[in-house]
Every structure is written in C-alpha cells, then in structure tokens.
Amino acid sequence: MSEQVKRVRVTQVGSPIGRKPGQKETLIGLGLHRMNASRELAATPETLGRIRKVKHLLKVEELS
C-alpha cells in the first residue's frame, strides 16, 4: 500500500559565478557545491521548485 517516492538525480553543469545570490543559495540548498557534482533527491514539490529555479545550471534525470 505504501507508495515509492519518486527520485531525481541532479547534476550541476553550469557555474554559479555571476549569478544572482538567490540562485547560488538554491544550488547550495540542493546540496550542489561544485561543477559536475550530483545528488539524488526525492521529487517533492519543494525540491522540484528549487530545480525549476536553476534549471539552466542543472542536468536532471528521473530515476525509477
């Protein structure tokens, strides 16, 4: 009866240098601190909103 939580893998492909402070903070909030760093995160509405805010700096893959 329990639903599996959908997961996404995000990889930072763009640099935060020269970006607005909010975008830098969002990357840090996602746990990304350097180029080519990856994290697997639960696909909650909060996480997807953060990803949407910096989508131009990320590569996003859905995991099964």
From Swiss-Prot:
Keywords annotated in UniProt: Ribonucleoprotein, Ribosomal protein
Keyword DNA-binding: no
Region (Disordered): 1-22
Record carries keyword Ribosomal protein: yes
Listed GO biological process terms: translation
A GO term for molecular function: structural constituent of ribosome
InterPro entries in UniProt: Ribo_uL30_ferredoxin-like_sf (IPR036919), Ribosomal_uL30_bac-type (IPR005996), Ribosomal_uL30_ferredoxin-like (IPR016082)
Oligomer and partners: Part of the 50S ribosomal subunit.
Family assignment from sequence similarity: Belongs to the universal ribosomal protein uL30 family.
Protein name according to UniProt: Large ribosomal subunit protein uL30
Source organism per UniProt: Acidiphilium cryptum (strain JF-5)
